[in-house]
Amino acid sequence: MNIFEELKARGLVFQTTDEQALVKALTEGQVSYYTGYDPTADSLHLGHLVAILTSRRLQLAGHKPYALVGGATGLIGDPSFKDAERSLQTKETVLEWSDKIKGQLSTFLDFENGDNKAELVNNYDWFSQISFIDFLRDVGKYFTVNYMMSKDSVKKRIETGISYTEFAYQIMQGYDFYELNDKHNVTLQIGGSDQWGNMTAGTELLRKKADKTGHVMTVPLITDSTGKKFGKSEGNAVWLDADKTSPYEMYQFWLNVMDDDAVRFLKIFTFLSLDEIAEIESQFNAARHERLAQKTLAREVVTLVHGEEAYKQALNITEQLFAGNIKNLSANELKQGLSNVPNYHVQSEDSLNLVDMLVTAGISPSKRQAREDVQNGAIYINGDRIQDLDYQLSNDDKIDDQLTVIRRGKKKYAVLTY
């Protein structure tokens, strides 16, 4: 099975320009290819991971990746299938975000070894050197307005309004392809399926300006089996930056993937062989309640993104919280595992009587209910049941001198911080 056949078997090929020519190029020699990442935030997220891992697969097959950080295009904003124009960021912010994204990409691509080691480029380096007049003369003349208006990504915005700034975005992305081809002999661009219009602007410019053929391959935008856009947890993006989405939160995200999606996601997001995945699928279908596919998915992706130690920690947090063994976890581990739990910062004037604190921290709705909860054995401090109505919280209840975990019943948690 050649690399293109494997990508197809994994569900990673959505659309290509001349497929036969692309397969020929990928199977007959080394291809230099690029994927672009606009710094629209200070971190990449799971939605970027499909293209990143596809790039890694191609590198492992011997091809040479260029990771383009859009320091210039990030200042403009891509209109593709957006309902409204993005708010523009300052140059300083975009350049800062660009540097952070560069660091994240080095986790996935090999920038050190071999004749196909990855290269990082930033389109700010060339766009900052070209004048507006030169750009219109040397690039703009190759694009007709009719051609630009025909793009689906533009059509969807015409009725609501699109600025010239965003309208010109496709020409800028097209010029990226031309520049990388001219300087580095890059002949293939990879991106999400929503980028097709912008990407083919690059092949059009290559054809008209340099009489060369470029290839484009898009990866699918991933949705779950209900059609919901992939990569969000409770409406929030799942970030690759551990400070924005902890390894534990990422682990839980994969662990909660629906059965109908789990095997498909193993093909897309892991480097397990297709034979290994087929074996996992067989075991998974025989005992779905054991969630083997989800557990494997969580292990593989968290290890890939954050490393084996982070995976082991996420697994340990999961197991200890499930067992109620709060004291077996450090304060930092509890902050990860209970990040979505109500948090109350204890004030110096607060009463440390347990009944009072249950009301103050919003765990029980009233003192009467709080007393009943304590007497009925429904209140736990750091995993220990407390039934003393006169119990006073003390330093002994502080884990690592930072926090106390209170549980009411089986599932209602609150964290006291000091």
Curated annotation (Swiss-Prot):
Q: What family does the Swiss-Prot or TrEMBL record give for this protein?
A: Belongs to the class-I aminoacyl-tRNA synthetase family. TyrS type 1 subfamily.
PANTHER family attached here?
TYROSINE--TRNA LIGASE, MITOCHONDRIAL, TYROSYL-TRNA SYNTHETASE
Main function:
Catalyzes the attachment of tyrosine to tRNA(Tyr) in a two-step reaction: tyrosine is first activated by ATP to form Tyr-AMP and then transferred to the acceptor end of tRNA(Tyr).
Please give the SMART domains that the UniProt record associates with this protein.
S4
**Motif interval(s): 'HIGH' region:** 39-48
Q: Which GO terms describe its molecular function?
A: ATP binding; RNA binding; tyrosine-tRNA ligase activity
Which gene codes for it? Answer: tyrS
Q: Where does the source fall among the domains of life? A: Bacteria
In Swiss-Prot or TrEMBL terms, this protein is called Tyrosine--tRNA ligase
Positions binding ATP in this chain are K232
